């Protein structure tokens, strides 16, 4: 696979950022102690034109090959507990990110070493640093076996001071993820769980009241972002009223547009107002929003018409796992990946076969089925997010300090306090 024609991507970013800093400081080496300018002089009346500030992300996108841009769209799994196997995959496909599961994770130091190894693989030939993510919602969805544990979102929402407890759980979780080199969390859940028989959301949700869920989503997003973590709310347009698990089937939610606006939309609107980094799509069909029968993940009406145009979101959209039945029942995995990008998704999570999904998207770009402008738009969003969250600048962590942060006395005390609040609130 081609890299970038020999152009040094991250070196270019560093150089352009330095130029931008110089421009912000005046962009001139002229002396500032030459004495005051006389009142009424031409110099006093003339304001020099500001030096345009270069955009390092735009410069980086221009320097990338089409193959490397397509790689940025993917978030595959990695194998093993060391970087050896994952590094080969990163070197071949140059993905935008990877996702960890328990089979990758043994101890805090081991995970930090794994993360650093994968970031070194991504940096070869001046490649782009990785998003390294996981599903650490706490409660019943927790991937790190050694993390400081907190109750479910539903339990946190039940305490007398849910704001404080949600904030504490997100802060501690974010700090521990960052310590082991995980810079992105697929959390918090923004679904309003109004169906008691919901087999997939349930206690992962903050509850059934859209206003309360929206408020606590905002609290969690702020707390995650304060730790430097890329937060991801899920599952748009709302997975809270289903009796079908999208891992094994394709749910149909019979909400009208009016019901969606009242019930499902508020948590996502709040997340957007709180500058959420990423929004994950749902593999669900909502005929009241799009009567095509396509899953929301592959619906331009939902991802572009509702999320982008109606709600005004311009951040990164990531699909839920493309290995799920809800994503593949109608079109198959490679075609699902192409249709998701065409609909407005920027990143593609966990295709069942990375090679075939990658080839399908690359072929679609080269044929024009996915316009180059759509690819560049997605990659620009991804890189800008990485720049804004410091991932382009500083992707590595100090593995020797990971065990001091994860499960620290302060974190364990905070978790015990929250657990006591949950017990007292019931």
Regions found by a protein language model. Give the residues of each.
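A non-catalytic, amphipathic alpha-helix used as a structural packing/dimerization or gating element
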Residues: 168, 172, 215, 219, ...
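Glycine-rich, aromatic-flanked loop segments that form ligand/cofactor-binding clefts
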Residues: 119-149, 169-191, 213-237
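A short aromatic-anchored loop/beta-hairpin motif
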Residues: 95-105, 287
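A substrate-binding/cap region within the structured catalytic cores of diverse enzymes
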Residues: 155-182, 189-221, 225, 405-412
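Preference for extracellular/luminal or secreted protein segments
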Residues: 2-19, 25-93, 329-426
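Second-shell residues forming the walls of enzyme active-site clefts
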Residues: 65, 85, 106-123, 208-374
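Hydrophobic faces of well-ordered beta-strands that scaffold small-molecule active sites
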Residues: 71-78, 96-100, 130-136, 184-188, ...
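Flexible hinge/switch segments at interdomain interfaces of large molecular machines
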Residues: 144, 189-195, 236-240, 392-399
């Amino acid at each position: 696979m081609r890299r970038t024609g020999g152009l040094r991507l991250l070196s270019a970013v560093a150089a352009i950022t330095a130029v931008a800093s110089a421009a912000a400081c005046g962009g001139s080496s002229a002396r500032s102690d030459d004495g005051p300018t006389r009142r009424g002089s031409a110099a006093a009346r003339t304001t020099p034109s500001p030096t345009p500030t270069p955009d390092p992300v735009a410069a980086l996108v221009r320097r990338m090959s089409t193959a490397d841009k397509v790689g940025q769209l993917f978030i595959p799994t990695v194998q093993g507990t060391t970087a050896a196997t994952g590094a080969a995959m990163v070197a071949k496909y140059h993905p935008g990110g990877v996702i960890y599961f328990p089979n990758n994770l043994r101890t805090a130091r081991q995970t930090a070493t794994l993360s650093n190894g994968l970031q070194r693989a991504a940096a070869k030939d001046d490649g782009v640093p990785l998003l390294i993510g996981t599903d650490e919602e706490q409660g019943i969805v927790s991937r790190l076996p050694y993390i400081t544990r907190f109750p479910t979102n539903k339990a946190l929402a039940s305490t007398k001071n849910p704001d404080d407890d949600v904030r504490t759980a997100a802060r501690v979780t974010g700090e521990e993820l960052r310590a082991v080199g995980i810079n992105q969390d697929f959390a918090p859940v923004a679904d309003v769980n109004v169906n008691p028989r919901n087999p997939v959301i349930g206690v992962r949700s903050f509850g059934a009241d859209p206003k309360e869920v929206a408020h606590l989503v905002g609290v969690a997003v702020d707390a995650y972002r304060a730790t430097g973590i890329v937060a991801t709310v899920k599952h748009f347009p709302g997975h809270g009223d289903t009796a079908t698990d999208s891992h094994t089937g394709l749910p149909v939610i019979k909400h009208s547009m009016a019901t969606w606006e009242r019930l499902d939309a508020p948590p996502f609107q709040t997340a957007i107002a709180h500058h959420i980094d990423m929004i994950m799509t749902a593999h669900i069909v909502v005929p009241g929003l799009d009567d095509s029968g396509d899953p929301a993940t592959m619906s331009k009406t939902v991802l572009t018409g509702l999320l982008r145009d109606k709600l005004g979101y311009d951040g990164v959209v990531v699909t839920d796992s493309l290995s799920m039945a809800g994503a593949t029942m109608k079109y198959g995995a490679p075609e699902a990946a192409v249709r998701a990008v065409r609909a407005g998704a920027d990143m593609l999570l966990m295709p069942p076969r990375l090679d075939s999904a990658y080839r399908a998207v690359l072929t679609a770009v080269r044929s024009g089925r996915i316009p180059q402008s759509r690819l560049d738009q997605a990659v620009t969003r991804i890189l800008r997010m990485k720049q804004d969250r410091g991932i382009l600048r500083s992707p590595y962590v100090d593995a020797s300090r990971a065990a001091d942060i994860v499960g620290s006395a302060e974190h364990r005390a905070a978790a015990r306090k929250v657990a006591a609040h949950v017990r007292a609130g019931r």
